[in-house]
């Protein structure tokens, strides 16, 4: 069975009160539409058609990819009309129809739905709701078979009492879809072409409409305003937290934890409150992350400890290394095994060798730091001359005194020491002591300035 997927993403989203197209509003670091596309790709379709309308250029620019065919719906005349715009491009046997503002749909749910597309049958995803207000109702015949879907505004009182709602997600034979689209009518309360009308057509044509339901009704919840968007965000995060806990992670409070990307975790990981994981993050066994930390596009090897209020981006932390509290590791940073970065230390494009230490109040940029080297408090690598970046190289077992300025390019060789308060502008050879400061001068009889008295 070949598969193509149509994602309806043309709506304006007026209740969002935003210049941003509704489907581009974010959930967990990606747009709602981005989440739907991600799920669609896992079904291995031969093509994905995205029907766009309001903000079409912005949507196309944000999400352009080789496997996406963007189809323009000039006028928003309903879900049926939107689907019809994609029909001329479909060549597969089966079509799955999804929605760009329903981001939590699970791949496993869609796989179950697709199994119903066999000769003489199509699949419809429905949901049981305590309050189905606003949903189309699933009308069944005396034998319990689906007969039709009636939109809420067109439903009678008896039909509104039905609690089985339509999600709008369909899996249909492609050769039937074009015919059904040509037979749609806008003779309804909204004056729109409803995709749901194909259900009655399918029944009339002798097809069986087989139904599936999601395990969690939130899978099919859309977002029409920012309140609903926030509800989807929180549900996504709780679901992500449950998955991580099932893999061996302890979350101090799953309600105060966010995943905004793809996270791979080991066992016996401890994550404290208010931690945000962004992009692609790899966390190995026995890692501890303190409260109020942001980890983005980084790898934390076995036994790493990140202390409170640290920001880690584009970094690799080796086994048993630690950072923080209040550490900032910027892109290109590598801490080798058991390296230590303390409070108010910032690294950018810097490598710290095994067991190297920078305890506090330090900036290390464009630097190579050897094993067991110790960086004193207040040390700054002066790596930028206003036009170009230059590198600082420290060998193994170097001792940098407090309050040093290391003016790059400069090379301080193994075993060398620099005196506190030095400005180092020249290379230092093995085991040398470098003193780069003016000699202290004590002046006798010096008188402190006095305040000028005002009249």
Swiss-Prot record:
Acetyl-CoA binds at residues 377, 383-384, 402, 420, 437. One of its GO terms (molecular function) is glucosamine-1-phosphate N-acetyltransferase activity. Pathway: Nucleotide-sugar biosynthesis; UDP-N-acetyl-alpha-D-glucosamine biosynthesis; N-acetyl-alpha-D-glucosamine 1-phosphate from alpha-D-glucosamine 6-phosphate (route II): step 2/2; Nucleotide-sugar biosynthesis; UDP-N-acetyl-alpha-D-glucosamine biosynthesis; UDP-N-acetyl-alpha-D-glucosamine from N-acetyl-alpha-D-glucosamine 1-phosphate: step 1/1; Bacterial outer membrane biogenesis; LPS lipid A biosynthesis. The keyword Iron-sulfur does not apply. UDP-N-acetyl-alpha-D-glucosamine binds at residues 8-11, 22, 73, 78-79, 99-101, 136, 151, 166, 224, 330, 348, 363, 374. Keywords: Acyltransferase, Cell shape, Cell wall biogenesis/degradation, Cytoplasm, Magnesium, Metal-binding, Multifunctional enzyme, Nucleotidyltransferase, Peptidoglycan synthesis, Repeat, Transferase. Disulfide bonds: none annotated. GO terms for cellular component: cytoplasm; membrane. The gene is glmU. It comes from Pseudomonas fluorescens (strain Pf0-1). Catalyzes the last two sequential reactions in the de novo biosynthetic pathway for UDP-N-acetylglucosamine (UDP-GlcNAc). The C-terminal domain catalyzes the transfer of acetyl group from acetyl coenzyme A to glucosamine-1-phosphate (GlcN-1-P) to produce N-acetylglucosamine-1-phosphate (GlcNAc-1-P), which is converted into UDP-GlcNAc by the transfer of uridine 5-monophosphate (from uridine 5-triphosphate), a reaction catalyzed by the N-terminal domain. InterPro entries: Bifunctional_GlmU (IPR005882), GlmU-like (IPR050065), GlmU_C_LbH (IPR038009), Hexapep (IPR001451), MobA-like_NTP_Trfase (IPR025877), Nucleotide-diphossugar_trans (IPR029044), Trimer_LpxA-like_sf (IPR011004). This is Bifunctional protein GlmU. Mg(2+) binds at residues 101, 224.
């Amino acid at each position: 069975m070949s598969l193509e997927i149509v994602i309806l993403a043309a709506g304006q989203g007026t209740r969002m009160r935003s210049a941003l197209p509704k489907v581009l509003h974010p959930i967990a670091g990606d747009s709602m539409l981005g989440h739907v596309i991600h799920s669609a790709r896992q079904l291995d379709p031969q093509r994905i058609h995205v029907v766009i309308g309001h903000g079409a250029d912005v949507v196309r620019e944000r999400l352009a990819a080789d496997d996406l065919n963007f189809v323009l719906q000039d006028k928003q005349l309903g879900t049926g009309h939107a689907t019809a715009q994609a029909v001329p491009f479909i060549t597969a046997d089966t079509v799955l129809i999804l929605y760009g503002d329903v981001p939590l749909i699970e791949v496993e749910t869609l796989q179950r739905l697709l199994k119903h597309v066999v000769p003489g049958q199509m699949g419809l995803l429905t949901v049981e709701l305590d309050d189905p207000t606003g949903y189309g109702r699933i009308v069944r015949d005396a034998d319990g078979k689906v007969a039709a879907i009636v939109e809420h505004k067109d439903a009678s009182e008896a039909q509104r009492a039905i609690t089985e709602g339509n999600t709008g997600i369909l899996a249909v034979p492609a050769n039937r879809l074009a015919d059904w689209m040509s037979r749609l009518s806008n003779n309804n309360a909204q004056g729109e072409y409803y995709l749901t009308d194909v259900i009655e057509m399918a029944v009339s044509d002798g097809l069986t409409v087989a139904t599936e339901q999601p395990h969690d009704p939130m899978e099919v919840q859309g977002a029409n305003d920012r309140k609903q968007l926030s509800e989807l965000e929180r549900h996504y995060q709780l679901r992500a937290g449950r998955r991580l806990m099932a893999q061996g992670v302890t979350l101090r409070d799953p309600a105060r934890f966010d995943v905004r990307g793809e996270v791979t975790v080991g066992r016996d990981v401890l994550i404290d409150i208010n931690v945000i994981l962004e992009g692609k993050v790899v966390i190995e066994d026995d890692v501890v992350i303190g409260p109020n930390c942001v980890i983005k596009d980084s790898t934390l090897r076995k036994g790493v400890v990140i202390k409170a209020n640290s920001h880690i981006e584009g970094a690799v932390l080796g086994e048993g290394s630690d950072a923080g509290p209040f550490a900032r590791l910027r892109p290109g940073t590598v801490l080798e095994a058991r390296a230590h970065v303390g409070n108010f230390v910032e690294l950018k494009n810097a490598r710290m060798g095994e067991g190297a230490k920078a305890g506090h109040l330090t900036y290390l940029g464009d630097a190579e730091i050897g094993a067991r080297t110790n960086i004193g408090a207040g040390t700054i690598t002066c790596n930028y001359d206003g036009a170009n970046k230059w590198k600082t190289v420290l060998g193994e077992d170097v001792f940098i005194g407090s309050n040093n300025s290391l003016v790059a390019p400069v090379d301080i060789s193994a075993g060398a020491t620099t005196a506190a308060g030095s400005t180092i502008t020249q290379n230092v050879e093995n085991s040398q002591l470098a003193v780069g400061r003016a000699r202290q001068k004590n002046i006798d009889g010096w008188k402190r300035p006095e305040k000028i008295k005002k009249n």
